[in-house]
Amino acid sequence: MSAPGSPDQAYDFLLKFLLVGDRDVGKSEILESLQDGTAESPYSHLGGIDYKTTTILLDGQRVKLKLWDTSGQGRFCTIFRSYSRGAQGVILVYDIANRWSFEGMDRWIKKIEEHAPGVPKILVGNRLHLAFKRQVPREQAQAYAERLGVTFFEVSPLCNFNIIESFTELARIVLLRHRLNWLGRPSKVLSLQDLCCRTIVSCTPVHLVDKLPLPIALRSHLKSFSMAKGLNARMMRGLSYSLTTSSTHKRSSLCKVKIVCPPQSPPKNCTRNSCKIS
């Protein structure tokens, strides 16, 4: 996975996906259905590898996908080892009208785990437009995907059904795995007031905010900010400090005590010579 090197590039993230499966399951049909893609493969002279790029929009981010596919022939196993290097996602493709292609998934998964272990995967049942010739029940494929812990789609390049959706879901899984969890969240720049509020409430319990020498409106905002942001969590964990006075040494000492509930404001008529502080 890579990010753009300059603002002129037309994408925010670059991902490499592999389409894996037996021959004649329609992997090339899936690639050909991508109208906006380009097909410039560095392995095109080998005649057994299809390559295409396309750009999808994921939560407002432009994600460019490099899609690689081999013909599924055994003589390309050595090539598979080479071009699987650096892959971020794998699309397991079978033909819903070809039972043998579905039963061969275990063989492909074993090969993937050998050359690209731990890479996120999705299972795709291709040629949904041939449902009248179906040999693989959807329920069986769904159960198989659940056993593998992967997402399952049935797609149709002829009807342009679920092609982009399946790519988008795999891209989402890959980006989340790489901890790019800012996708889908608005990039908000904190104001100076928010930064000041965060600093104050991080070291001041809620019940002591009212005692700060600040305008009433600002104190109210600070309490609301503290409740909303949860920055008072360390006071809620059942630990606090108590300032006690020693009668023998006539000096104050700070000792750690446990409380079983969140600290609250002491009553006005309290006669204790100690109070809770953070």
From Swiss-Prot:
Lipid attachment residues per UniProt (S-palmitoyl cysteine): 270
SUPFAM superfamilies attached to this UniProt entry: P-loop containing nucleoside triphosphate hydrolases, SOCS box-like
Effect the entry attributes to changing residue 59 to G: Renders the protein unstable and disrupts its cytoplasmic localization
Pathway(s) this gene product operates in, as recorded in its UniProt entry: Protein modification; protein ubiquitination
Binding residues annotated for GTP, in chain numbering: 26-28, 72, 126-127
Key word Magnesium present: yes
SMART domains linked to this entry: RAB, RAN, RAS, RHO, SOCS, SOCS_box
Subcellular location: Membrane; Cytoplasm; Mitochondrion
Region Switch-I, annotated ranges: 41-49
Free-text tissue specificity from the UniProt record: Expressed in brain, lung, heart, skeletal muscle, kidney and liver. Highest expression in brain. Expressed in fetal brain and kidney.
A GO CC term attached to the entry: mitochondrion
Pfam families for the chain: Ras, SOCS_box
Regulation: Regulated by guanine nucleotide exchange factors (GEFs) which promote the exchange of bound GDP for free GTP. Regulated by GTPase activating proteins (GAPs) which increase the GTP hydrolysis activity. Inhibited by GDP dissociation inhibitors (GDIs).
GO BP, one annotated term: intracellular signal transduction
Similarity comment text for this entry: Belongs to the small GTPase superfamily. Rab family.
Chain's role: May act as substrate-recognition component of the ECS(RAB40) E3 ubiquitin ligase complex which mediates the ubiquitination and subsequent proteasomal degradation of target proteins. The Rab40 subfamily belongs to the Rab family that are key regulators of intracellular membrane trafficking, from the formation of transport vesicles to their fusion with membranes. Rabs cycle between an inactive GDP-bound form and an active GTP-bound form that is able to recruit to membranes different sets of downstream effectors directly responsible for vesicle formation, movement, tethering and fusion.
Domains (record comment): The SOCS box contains two defined motifs including the BC box that recruits and binds Elongin BC complex, and the Cul box which interacts with the Cullin family of proteins to form a ECS (Elongin-Cullin-SOCS-box protein) E3 ubiquitin ligase complex.
Protein's name according to its UniProt entry: Ras-related protein Rab-40A-like
UniProt source species: Homo sapiens
Upper lineage: Eukaryota, Metazoa, Chordata, Craniata, Vertebrata
